[in-house]
């Protein structure tokens, strides 16, 4: 469903209101403890944030992609780590099931994912394989009516939190890119093992894990889509992911600007608020301009996608510009705070830690170029 501008603004306001009420007041504490109450995701589902592009018959909101990324910006402005769990659940996991899943898989998984009962995770990256996704080594070997999965995945968002995993594995070692398949399966399988929860610079409100598949047996019916089409399934929505990261970056940068602007109005030097000093005012103006430019880039790319047009180049541009912009803006926000910006008493310290990853995941800045 493609919506009009007024509808998009209404969706943005729903997401913003939720974020300001349910996330912002608690984000610093959740960052400190590296834990988020599971019921938060149930609450997100109640307002339609966990299955935004999924058809209503499966419990989703049936909205367009632009609605999704606008909501993503709002959640990311409150906390980047929580926004990333929302992203993984919506796309690629739920979207992939809707696009290529069997009727049984849709019945088994989609309503649980959209309701917040279950959370999904995507298992593609491996310890030595990031941007070169076709070089993965996790194996799936057929054994009667089952597949046996062995291997290790790395940097898995919500790897410990999630209830269902979309796993990309090699089913035909001689098949090249056509020898890779996708599986969708619950994580309560005894062969699914969390090796480590990573200690991260930022995004501490979600768990990022290394996952091992120890002779993990899954029924043949857990294959997602056709055999040999796994890499295509994983990468088919890559542009969606990159536009989503651009929206996350804009959200983080916007939070940094808001914090810097507020501080600049309160902090006084030489008898007046520092916002009245041209050096600071110019910084804030530049920050606001860069944020709006990044927003227009991701909004344009999302609009192309909603119209069924090719958007790979525009998605890469949006992610590249927005992710690097977010670090610059967060850095300037710290500078405006002076020494206080280096302390975790002020939000810009956390924001800076959170935005740094946007230049890395969903394809590094170098890959976008």
Stretch-by-stretch model annotation:
Residues 135, 188-219:
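Flexible, small-/acidic-enriched active-site or ligand-binding loops
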Residues 63, 132-134, 158-163, 176-179, ...:
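Short glycine/proline-enriched turns and hinge-like loops at secondary-structure junctions
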Residues 113, 128-131, 155-158, 172-174, ...:
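Short Gly/Pro-enriched turn/cap motifs at secondary-structure boundaries
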Residues 48, 72-76, 169, 185-190, ...:
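Short Ser/Thr-interspersed hydrophobic loop/turn segments at strand-loop and sheet-helix junctions
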Residues 146, 150-194:
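A short core secondary-structure module
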Residues 1-88, 100-105, 112-117, 132, ...:
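Alpha-helical interface subdomain recognition
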Residues 116-124:
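A short, Trp-centered hydrophobic/proline-enriched beta-strand micro-motif
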Residues 94-100, 122, 134:
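Flexible, glycine-rich active-site loops centered on histidine and acidic residues
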């Amino acid at each position: 469903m493609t919506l009009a501008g007024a509808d998009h603004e209404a969706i943005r306001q729903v997401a913003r209101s939720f974020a300001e009420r349910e996330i912002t007041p608690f984000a610093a504490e959740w960052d400190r403890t590296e834990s988020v109450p599971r019921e938060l995701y149930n609450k997100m589902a109640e307002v339609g944030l966990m299955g935004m592009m999924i058809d209503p018959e499966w419990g989703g909101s049936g909205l367009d992609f632009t609605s999704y990324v606008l909501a993503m910006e709002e959640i990311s402005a409150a906390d980047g780590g929580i926004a990333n769990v929302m992203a993984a659940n919506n796309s690629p996991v739920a979207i992939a099931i809707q696009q290529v899943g069997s009727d049984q898989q849709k019945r088994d998984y989609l309503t649980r994912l959209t309701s917040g009962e279950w959370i999904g995770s995507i298992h593609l990256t491996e310890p030595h394989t990031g941007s070169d996704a076709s070089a993965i080594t996790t194996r799936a070997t057929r054994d009667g009516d089952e597949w046996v999965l062995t291997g290790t995945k790395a940097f898995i968002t919500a790897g410990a939190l999630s209830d269902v995993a979309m796993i990309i594995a090699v089913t035909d070692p001689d098949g090249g890119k056509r020898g890779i398949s996708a599986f969708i399966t619950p994580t309560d399988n005894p062969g699914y093992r969390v090796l480590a929860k990573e200690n991260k610079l930022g995004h501490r409100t979600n768990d990022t894990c290394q996952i091992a598949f120890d002779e993990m047996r899954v029924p043949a019916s857990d294959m997602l889509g056709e055999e040999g089409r796994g890499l295509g399934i994983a990468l088919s929505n890559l542009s969606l992911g990159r536009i989503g990261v651009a929206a996350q970056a804009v959200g983080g940068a916007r939070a940094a600007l808001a914090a810097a602007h507020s501080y600049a109005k309160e902090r006084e030097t030489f008898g007046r608020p520092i916002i009245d000093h041209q050096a600071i005012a110019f910084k804030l103006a530049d920050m606001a301009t860069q944020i709006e430019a990044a927003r227009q880039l991701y909004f344009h790319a999302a609009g192309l996608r909603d119209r069924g047009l090719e958007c790979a180049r525009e998605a890469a541009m949006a992610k590249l510009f927005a992710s690097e912009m977010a670090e610059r803006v967060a850095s300037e926000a710290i500078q405006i705070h002076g020494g206080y910006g280096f302390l975790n008493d002020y939000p810009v310290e956390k924001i800076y830690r959170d935005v740094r990853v946007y230049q890395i995941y969903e394809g590094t800045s170098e890959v976008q170029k």
